[in-house]
Amino acid sequence: RVVALRDGSEARSYIPLSRESLRDRSQAGLAERFDGEFLRAAVRPRHARGAREVRVADLFAGCGVMSLGLWEACRAVSARMVPVLAVDSNEVALAVYRSNFAGALTIPSPIERLVDGDLGSPVTATERNLLSRIGRVDVLIGGPPCQGHSNLNNHTRRIDLKNALYARMARFAEIAQPTHVVIENVTAVRHDRGRVVD
């Protein structure tokens, strides 16, 4: 895979291809084959030697799908993702995360117990403790609950209390001050009655 970088240079990443993929020499579907080989690989490809470190916190981490995507994106641009924190209230999903990203501090807890301050307020003792355990954060990723924001089968959930969990992402960004923040959600989140996007 070749990725064009902002400075005009290129970063290359490689995946060992299966015999089946090697037989198909067409360009059609090449990206899908590349991604499929990556997802099916028994061992993850290595990062380039001397790759710069990108420290990542994943809130509402689940089993780590967003972290996996960011891991591959970092590898594609010759960087090395270092997961420093994964938080999710689902212990089973977090166990899967832990098996895929062994170095991360994984905390099976509702995020509001760890990031408990209001936006704009001083850092709380709980938040200070969490930050001291993880150090610097370069990228914050997360997918707060989207059921209350979805237009599918949604008649009463626009006022669901879980919709406010979106603000925990903003609060963590405020206190950890990452360089980049990626929040995944449904597009209808913009219509939330609590104006969580604003």
Residue ranges of predicted features:
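N-terminal accessory interaction module
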Residues: R1-G8
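Conserved active-site and SAM-binding loop architecture
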Residues: G8, S13-D198
